[in-house]
UniProtKB/Swiss-Prot annotation:
Pfam families in UniProt: Glyco_hydro_79n (PF03662)
Entry EC number(s): 3.2.-.-
Class of this enzyme: hydrolase
Name listed for the protein in its UniProt record: Heparanase-like protein 2
Entry's Gene Ontology cellular component terms: extracellular region; lysosomal membrane
InterPro entries: Glyco_hydro_79, Glycoside_hydrolase_SF
Known function: Endoglycosidase which is a cell surface and extracellular matrix-degrading enzyme. Cleaves heparan sulfate proteoglycans (HSPGs) into heparan sulfate side chains and core proteoglycans.
A GO MF term: beta-glucuronidase activity
Annotated source species: Arabidopsis thaliana
Mode of membrane association: Peripheral membrane protein
UniProt entry keywords in alphabetical sequence: Glycoprotein, Hydrolase, Lysosome, Membrane, Secreted, Signal
Protein family: Belongs to the glycosyl hydrolase 79 family.
Amino acid sequence: MGFNVVVFLSCLLLLPPVTFGSNMERTTLVIDGSRRIAETDENFICATLDWWPPEKCNYDQCPWGYASLINLNLASPLLAKAIQAFRTLRIRIGGSLQDQVIYDVGDLKTPCTQFKKTDDGLFGFSEGCLYMKRWDEVNHFFNATGAIVTFGLNALHGRNKLNGTAWGGDWDHTNTQDFMNYTVSKGYAIDSWEFGNELSGSGIWASVSVELYGKDLIVLKNVIKNVYKNSRTKPLVVAPGGFFEEQWYSELLRLSGPGVLDVLTHHIYNLGPGNDPKLVNKILDPNYLSGISELFANVNQTIQEHGPWAAAWVGEAGGAFNSGGRQVSETFINSFWYLDQLGISSKHNTKVYCRQALVGGFYGLLEKETFVPNPDYYSALLWHRLMGKGILGVQTTASEYLRAYVHCSKRRAGITILLINLSKHTTFTVAVSNGVKVVLQAESMKRKSFLETIKSKVSWVGNKASDGYLNREEYHLSPKDGDLRSKIMLLNGKPLVPTATGDIPKLEPVRHGVKSPVYINPLSISFIVLPTFDAPACS
């Protein structure tokens, strides 16, 4: 008996420390497990690979290096392991320069050369080339790492510039068709083909009218049917990969019609420019973060009213545009924005969310030279492993600084709760209720023996559990040394860094008595897994 008490007391050292001197606020989450309010794709988490060459610069900084599809070091063991850790990570190949990429296959009318800086090119660059030798290398890498590939096609090929940003003329699909034929002949698996990048509406540097775009999607669909006529499965058609304008998007669905466009994609950079001095303030402002909800609701409504056959994806989202915010996007603080937006978007039936970028800029999930994961990488990996497809409704008595999102757990019973504490001074003690009874209590309500009390508070690391009390898993995320701009994230107090053998570290929870309270420290993030929560919608 005495020995057991000593063991329990020793294990108390594993508990995430409650921040002393902070305010304490008790709150209850009321979770409706009877129905799903929305649903994501099985592979909701996605990351992009861009085309930017090393000469891409913003604000006198050039943060891309060798991070493009054309020059990325595919021989890096850590890069491969970072993707393999997801088992099935969707990778969207695309970006600003995709509508200037020529595929070096078939009968080309002009030489296929690499991107060069030029004053008269879109985004300050000439056309670029994807050589088939490189395409072979990329596909061997994707096959070895289990990646699910979405490829962004050049939608300006054959067109001519009219005036301003407008481009006209028919899309020349021959280069795309030759490229697809080569891809199929090699047996390379492409899950989906995306048409164009940021050409919708008024565009960024270039735009195509919705009338032309709708017509071209029908052409693309027929090209895919022809190229894949002997294939058991056919890739999805994805478009337009632009910034949402309700009228333009609605018209695109109407003009292309049922059975053509499978996925409607839009881009988000709601934090503004990467050099905004108020970037951190925006990330920590719950009202600012919530402002994006209307956009997701409008996209969802547009699909329901004008194209219920299509799914909504976020095709590209980096938080801050122009390569992200230096010493912000690659640090712990960015996970407040990133995870919160994953939560908001999923509540509005967003099926896939592609983060800009896997590598490159300041917003890369991986450091561009070493491929060492940045904090958002681990946030994405935890979401991918823990958060299932089904989203449940949740109400809370807490202030707006405590963000709560609830999903069915992934490939297991019960639910997973994502809690984000944006408060600088308040520790939240969280109880959970299914609307009928309190499942987790914010404080102990009945007298227990000393040993029972210790057992309900203690936390275990790994799979160890002494009895039925110990069946709640917690993943508490915080920055190293309390520095929100640290590039090192702590999981339950332990630094998340590659192992001595160059592997992605294990993401192990602490386990608590299911009836003990959940503590969420100021400026921290937690995933809470409740395998015994009764949620019929998750069956």
